[in-house]
Amino acid sequence: MNMDERLQAFKRLLDIMDAVRAGCPWDSTQTIQSLRHLTIEETYELSQAILNDDLNEVKKELGDLMLHLVFYAKIGQEQGAFDITDVLNGICEKMIVRHPHIFGSEHVDNAEQVERNWEKIKLEREHNRSVLGGVPDGLPSLLKAYRMAQKTAGVGFRWLDATQAWQKVEEEKTELFEALQTPADTAHVEEEYGDLLFALAAYGNYIGVNPDDALEKTDKKFRERFAHVEQRAREQGKGVQHLTLDEMIAYWKEAK
């Protein structure tokens, strides 16, 4: 696809948005606030398409998200706050500033250096912003822990290597075990359990594993294996709740 075709396709979307915003009873009443939960839903649908490795569905979901981005820009324009040009120029400038090794004279040897430079550049340009200011509170907790550890590592607050990071996991595991010796103190148990989860999430940065991706794959594996257990129960004319634990374990192992 050449440049003209891309521009024409984008203009077509903008024109359609202008039309539905002006004439559709539903589109004309939407606000930035009313669209928020719908955008979250669309993002999760894109995530599911990616997990399913369904590129045709990824294409469709990207279109849905693109519509939402144009929708927000249209509302911003109506309110005199910003328009699509401001949005696009803003991200273009951000990309140029954050890639001095592409658009400037800086040299980097690997992706880790690029990430560290990003954090340095952001702090220099936004003097009063916390290192963790770019991690939304609304992120799922496991992913948020991973990103917080990643962000602080970018400014040097990190273990030297994966071995040290794992030692922290072992330390937190021991502290949780000790807390469990007093099970009535549920607040302390919860705190230590949280510390262990955070340490495991942070450890992912040292072994190149995103914990959210890893857990998602394990969730999928668990679902598929338990579906096999349920299928084996149906073959016997039983509900899964009527299987013995030994039977469940045997069918579970079959699914591995």
PLM region spans:
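Flexible "arm" and connector segments at domain edges
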Residues: 1-61, 67-193, 197-256
